[in-house]
């Protein structure tokens, strides 16, 4: 279930999280995008995926609701070497990660209660025109640019 994020919360989160994510990645970030509140119900799983590379390069998942008396719902990151690392992600914590580069998931079904999270993503300043941006990122960015041009010209 997706719920709208109250504007006052959105206005607080960007300036609060951006410096923390700047420090995490060791770079200056831009274009913060917020998504939330996403509510997961018992039995939910999050399949392994990477986020869109044009917007979610450096991200944080903020756990805003999970009863601490219930079992953890592990968050799994899979490194480039294929090895998985699991994290307990407790209420009130922000989990920072490279969302467009690392596969991430919640492979076990959610047991008991609900889990609610807000997600925020940023791109490095100058991205995707920096050496670390891969071909997939440049391709997606190019396609999106063409779509925007088509919309402005009334072709789409």
Regions flagged by a language model, labelled:
Residues 106-112:
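Short proline/glycine-enriched turn/loop segments at secondary-structure junctions
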Residues 14-18, 57, 113:
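A structural signal for well-ordered alpha-helical scaffolds and beta->alpha junctions
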Residues 40-102, 114-117, 123-138:
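Catalytic core of non-heme Fe(II) oxygenases with the double-stranded beta-helix
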Residues 134-156:
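Acidic/histidine-enriched, glycine/proline-rich intrinsically disordered or flexible terminal extensions
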Residues 1-3, 34-37:
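Short secondary-structure junction/hinge motifs that connect adjacent elements
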Residues 11-15, 31, 50-54:
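Alpha-helix initiation and capping sites
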Residues 1-25:
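Non-heme Fe(II)/2-oxoglutarate
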Residues 26-36:
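A short coil-to-beta-strand element that immediately follows conserved catalytic motifs
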């Amino acid at each position: 279930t997706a719920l709208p994020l109250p504007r006052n919360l959105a206005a607080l989160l960007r300036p609060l999280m951006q410096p923390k994510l700047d420090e995490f990645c060791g770079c200056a970030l831009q274009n913060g995008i917020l998504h939330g509140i996403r509510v997961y119900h018992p039995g939910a799983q999050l399949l392994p995926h990477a986020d869109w590379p044009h917007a979610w390069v450096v991200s944080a998942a903020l756990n805003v609701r999970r009863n601490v008396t219930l079992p953890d719902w592990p968050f799994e990151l899979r490194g480039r070497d294929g090895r998985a690392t699991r994290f307990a992600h407790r209420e009130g914590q922000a989990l920072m990660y490279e969302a467009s580069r690392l596969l991430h998931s919640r492979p076990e079904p959610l047991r008991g209660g609900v889990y609610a999270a807000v997600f925020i993503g940023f791109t490095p300043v100058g991205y995707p025109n920096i050496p670390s941006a891969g071909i997939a990122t440049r391709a997606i960015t190019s396609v999106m640019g063409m779509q925007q041009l088509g919309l402005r010209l009334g072709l789409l």
